[in-house]
């Protein structure tokens, strides 16, 4: 009995203090326009970036990307972020895709919305990484060209 009185007292007190709780709330329907999906800025930016590329260029970059092993992709990404050298095996894989592929992929990837702000720091690192691989590994596979420094 005491518990029921306490609960009634708490509800009555709360209803007086917070009068909106004690009143019925009018529920209005939500307009479909307010739920319309609007693409994020990143999507729009990257879509615009791709729209300026030819199908041939997109295919070229896709083929370049397919030539890199996933292990070396991870190692190179970590190397670019941490400014560390990559293994000899990944240097070989890296150099075999060719300078044009490397340069094209780096330019494209770091033009995307998420990475465009770090491009000025990362692109020079990618050139240093390429040059270091040329210096240490190129003689074993034929001599790709180094980037100008």
UniProtKB/Swiss-Prot annotation:
It comes from the Eukaryota. It holds the Pfam family Prolamin_like. GO terms for cellular component: filiform apparatus. Mostly expressed in embryo sac cells. Restricted to synergid cells, especially in the filiform apparatus of mature female gametophyte, via MYB98-mediated transcription regulation. Also detected at low levels in egg and central cells. Keywords: Signal. Residues 1-22 form the signal peptide. InterPro entries: DD11 (IPR040220), Prolamin-like (IPR008502). PANTHER family: DOWNREGULATED IN DIF1 18-RELATED, ECA1 GAMETOGENESIS FAMILY PROTEIN (DUF784)-RELATED-RELATED. This is Protein DOWN-REGULATED IN DIF1 11. It comes from Arabidopsis thaliana.
